[in-house]
């Protein structure tokens, strides 16, 4: 359906006294083309409510058991796409964003993985930077394919994934990070005072490591 046909259908239902649900595929607020639909409804003075859902990039994080913003690794998330029939401004190219080394989530790019890898590498990511392809995040048929920037195209091809997938790129997928300040006993917040010094915390960590090592040695005897 075209925009005009969609609006005509909603107008007709409104005139018939029906409640209309415009159930949108994908993420309506990301590459969803809903602004033009809302503007048309406003012109026609038809009231509506925009009901948000869980974004697929959030669903992908859950599927990956990942946090996109890890201390010491990345505190920013870039949501973007490869240029297709809808162009992307040059200043917003994947290559430009890759230079920041932030976590990247790419929509609508599953059919361009060879080109995507080249753009990411040219922008500054190494070939062995952790990456993942999440097919139909949160759906029953969800697939999680872990790979690297250099093996994106091969991984998707071997799993026969050609569309309906998100690409996640960044060191946050590696598992190495710094402990957060939020739950750090040496850190004072609005709700609690620091309970120990960094030196004391270090000694506690060393003692725990020694106890774990001794326990492991005892079990091996």
Where is each model-derived feature located?
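Short, acidic/small-residue loops that bind anionic groups at enzyme active sites
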Residues: 40-60, 71-80
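Class I S-adenosyl-L-methionine
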Residues: 1-51
């Amino acid at each position: 359906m075209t925009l005009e046909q969609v609006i005509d259908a909603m107008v007709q239902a409104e005139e018939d006294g029906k409640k209309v649900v415009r159930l949108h595929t994908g993420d309506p607020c990301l590459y969803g083309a809903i602004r033009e639909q809302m503007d048309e409804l406003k012109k026609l003075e038809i009231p509506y409510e925009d009901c948000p859902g869980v974004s697929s990039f959030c669903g992908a994080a859950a599927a990956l058991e990942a946090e996109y913003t890890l201390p010491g690794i990345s505190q920013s998330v870039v949501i973007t796409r490869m240029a297709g029939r809808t162009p992307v401004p040059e200043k917003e190219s994947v290559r430009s964003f890759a230079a920041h080394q932030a976590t990247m989530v790419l929509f609508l790019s599953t059919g361009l993985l060879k080109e995507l890898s080249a753009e990411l590498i040219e922008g500054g990511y190494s070939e062995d930077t952790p990456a993942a392809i999440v097919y139909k995040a949160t759906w029953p048929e969800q697939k999680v394919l872990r790979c690297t920037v250099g093996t994106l195209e091969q991984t998707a091809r071997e799993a026969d994934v050609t569309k309906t997938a998100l690409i996640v790129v960044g060191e946050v997928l590696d598992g190495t990070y710094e402990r957060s300040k939020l739950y750090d006993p040496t850190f004072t917040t609005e709700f609690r005072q620091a309970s120990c010094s960094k030196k004391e915390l270090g000694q506690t960590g060393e003692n725990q490591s020694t106890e774990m090592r001794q326990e492991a040695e005892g079990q091996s005897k």
